[in-house]
UniProtKB/Swiss-Prot annotation:
Belongs to the polyribonucleotide nucleotidyltransferase family. It comes from the Bacteria. Mg(2+) binds at residues 482, 488. This is Polyribonucleotide nucleotidyltransferase. It comes from Wolbachia sp. subsp. Brugia malayi (strain TRS). The lineage of its organism: Bacteria, Pseudomonadati, Pseudomonadota, Alphaproteobacteria, Rickettsiales. Its cofactor is Mg(2+). One of its GO terms (biological process) is mRNA catabolic process.
Length: 755
């Protein structure tokens, strides 16, 4: 029934296999990829389009359902919903790797679905997903003539490169680099690095490319065994339209010489309309005209840049646009920055929170918590578009993650800065490289906030104009240069090295020479941008902003953690409610208190210490009247504990009723004279001077008081004998008193823990 074809190799110490003929046989191409115990089903379906479109309708979806990890989805709904960020990012990696390889003019609808069947939590799925997508395309009949592969590269503590590192190895790796390429060139790179120099990054790319070759050979052998032939494809001939456009060359040259984006865009729109209308009247298809105009502009612009040595806005190849930097522009936020580079502008705002504000991520490796979040927003008005603002799409998620990777390596450890950090980048204007403007703005905003980042970070986007063996590398590309060029190579880092990298191609790959020169030119541009940023702010503020929450931390004994939390969280909840603060207690006994002011944080700290302090006989405490019975007053102590006081301990003279002296809600100072069997303290008001808070050492019992048989046990305390009171040291335990002399709890580092 099944005609199964399977090929496999040993790669990176694990078995990589490709199999087809058993599952999803109605798809044009279907491949099951196994790498270790990670298994992915990749399907390719092609739908021929009669309608002419000026883009490639390629849709790539990576789907990771929880059954692949042996789990049931959490939450109320037990069915997967919208794609996670991880699924979106893997889908983008595959899309960006294969999109440039489709033949120009091919516009059939292509759907690629990568279904994660099993995941061993060791081998990340990005690599087998891309390999499976290429293998499925190779056997689908789609005119896709390039065979590529993907690889992960890590770097250990001895600067040794690791091929396809495991999830555990990636946690300690100084490099997380994914690249795709063919036998001769590099197609796509994405990485996060811990300030690695350009040479290390280039060597990692060479290492990865070398280890791609066995996989490329495997895919070719797999496709040859099946023997599927590619469908013939011939693009529609638009040479006659292209020839007709030659007479508009001068108009386009003048338009592209305008340095202001809005003026340039308006002029180009006018020229295009002047071209479109007559050709439509002549019977030409509008979409073919649009495609021809795009090709003509691309060819003309590339010629201008190569021959004249200047760019659209008059800059040299390696020249950076004018940069303006401002910080602290929003008064009530925790930190803000406005970064403007030419006509690209990012308003970046930070907000600080507690551990309770961390993002819980349901990842394929299991639930994890993120204490640093970076959200990138690209509203339509940033490019003068009138369309409605919608939820973030793949592009916004991808750009935000790239900026996150650029900043993440320089963030302080959570033990050093325990706040949860959220950064939001609002793109106000865009003319290319808005993601790198986000990187620069985020670095500035974090320093303005007071986050102790290790070094400032800047980012730059590089472009490429390539004609056969001749090429020109452009620094800080405009939107038009990105649209009409061959490469978008984003590089972010500090003065010491690279923290993030992303390279996308519009051609079928570039050489190591171009990669190396791009990195060198990007470094010069990055250092120039850092110089501009450092002239405004080069170090983080000494303290967080006035509107940011204050934090104080201290340690308690581990055996007191349960008491600090209380039954079902009662104690910690009570302290939070009474102090208007947030309190977090770690397994190591570290208590972190967050409040809107230092004074509130200190009050909450003292309340927490009081709540776990054991009372002693002779202690003087603040109390509050909760309930009054005939002869007993129920009291609440500073730490929320309950206490009792007999009518005979209210005053030093005979009273007919407690209400004649006290009423509910009254507060006063009381002496702890004894404890009931259950631990409830017995208290006395009459033995304490309410003005000074001192203990009446020598006061005698008023003879007018009469003992009763019911009260005899209550007075059977050494403090209640009529012969006088035993002298003993007395400790004041007031939640409002000076605590400088009170005993320390563990290692109290509160003075050094304020931010």
């Amino acid at each position: 029934m099944f005609e199964i074809i399977k090929k496999s190799i040993e790669w990176g110490g694990r078995t990589l296999s490709l199999e087809t003929g058993k599952i999803a046989r109605q798809a044009d191409g279907s491949v099951v990829v196994n790498y270790g115990d990670t298994s992915i089903l990749v399907t390719v379906v092609r739908k021929k389009k009669e309608e002419i479109v000026d883009f490639l309708p390629l849709n790539v979806q990576f789907i990771a359902k929880s059954y692949a990890m042996g789990r049931i989805p959490g939450g109320f709904f037990k069915r997967e919903g919208k794609p996670s960020d991880r699924e979106t990012l893997i889908s983008r990696v595959i899309d960006r790797s294969i999109r440039p390889l489709f033949l120009e003019g091919f516009h059939d609808e292509i759907s690629i679905v990568c279904n994660l069947l099993t995941y061993d939590t060791v081998n990340p799925p990005e690599v087998p997903a891309l390999i499976g997508a290429v293998a499925a395309l190779a056997i689908s009949g789609v005119p896709f003539h390039f065979i590529i592969a993907g690889v992960l590269v890590g770097c250990d503590g001895n600067n040794n490169y690791i091929l396809n590192p495991s999830v555990q190895e990636m946690k300690v790796s100084s490099l997380d680099l994914f690249l795709s390429g063919d036998e001769r060139s590099i197609l796509m790179v994405e990485s996060e690095a811990k300030e690695l120099p350009e040479e290390n990054i280039l060597n990692a790319i060479k290492f990865g490319h070398e280890h791609l070759q066995p996989v490329i050979k495997l895919i070719k052998e797999f496709a040859d065994t099946i023997g599927n032939k590619f469908d013939s494809f011939a693009p529609i001939d638009i040479s006659d339209i292209m020839q007709d456009l030659e007479k508009h060359s001068k108009d386009f040259e003048e338009a592209y010489s305008q340095t202001v984006k809005q003026e340039r865009a308006q002029t180009l729109e006018t020229i295009r309309n002047n071209i479109l209308n007559p050709l439509k009247e002549a019977g030409k298809d509008e979409k073919l005209i649009t495609q021809a105009v795009k090709n003509f502009e691309r060819s003309l612009l590339r010629k201008i840049i190569r021959e004249k040595g200047t760019r659209i806005d008059g800059r040299k190849y390696d020249e950076i646009r004018q940069i303006e930097v401002e910080v602290d522009i929003l008064s009530r936020t925790h930190g803000s920055a406005l970064f403007t580079r030419g006509s690209t502008q990012a308003l970046v705002v930070t907000a600080l929170g507690t551990t309770q504000d961390e993002q819980i991520v349901d990842d394929i490796e299991g639930d994890r918590r993120e204490h640093f979040m970076l959200h990138y927003n690209f509203p339509s008005f940033a490019v003068g578009d009138a369309s409605a603002i919608r939820a973030p799409g793949r592009r916004e998620i991808g750009h935000g993650k790239l900026a996150w990777k650029a900043i993440h390596p320089v963030l302080p450890d959570k033990s050093e800065f325990p706040y949860t950090i959220r950064v939001v980048s609002e793109i106000m204007e865009s003319d290319g490289s808005s993601s790198m403007a986000t990187v620069c703005g985020t670095s500035l905003a974090l320093m303005d906030t007071g986050v102790p980042i290790k070094s400032p970070v800047a980012g730059i986007a590089m472009g490429l104009i390539k004609d056969k063996n001749d090429y020109v590398i452009l620094s800080d590309i405009l939107g038009d240069e990105d649209y009409l060029g061959d490469m978008d190579f984003k590089v972010a880092g500090t003065s010491e090295g690279i923290t993030a990298l992303q390279m996308d191609m519009k051609i079928s790959g570039i050489s190591f020479e171009i990669v190396e020169k791009s990195l060198e030119q990007a470094k010069a541009g990055r250092l120039h941008i850092l110089e501009k940023m450092n002239s405004v702010i080069s170090e983080h503020s000494d303290d967080v902003k006035g509107h940011a929450p204050r934090m104080v931390s201290f340690y308690i004994d581990k055996d007191k953690i349960s008491a600090a939390i209380g039954a079902k969280g009662k104690n910690i909840r009570s302290v939070c409610e009474r102090s208007n603060a947030k309190i977090e207690i770690g397994d190591d006994g570290k208590v972190s208190v967050f409040a809107m002011s230092s004074a509130e944080a200190e009050i909450a700290k003292n309340m927490m210490i009081d709540s776990i302090t054991e009372l002693e006989q002779g202690a003087i405490v603040d109390v509050k009247v909760v309930k009054i019975d005939k002869s007993i007053v129920e009291l609440e102590l500073f730490n929320g504990r309950k206490g009792k006081m007999h009518i005979s301990e209210v005053a030093n003279q005979h009273i007919e009723s407690i209400e004649s002296i006290l009423k509910q809600g009254d507060t006063f100072k009381a002496l702890v004279i004894d404890f009931e069997k259950g631990g409830c303290p017995k208290l006395s008001r009459r033995r304490v001077d309410q003005e000074t808070g001192d203990f009446f050492e020598g006061e005698l019992y008023n003879e007018e008081k009469k003992d009763s048989s019911n009260d005899r046990d209550y007075y059977n305390s050494p403090f209640n004998r009529k012969s006088g009171h035993r002298k003993r040291p007395v400790h004041s335990r007031s939640s409002f008193s000076n605590r400088n002399n009170r005993p320390k709890f563990g290692n109290d580092d509160s003075s050094s823990s304020f931010y």
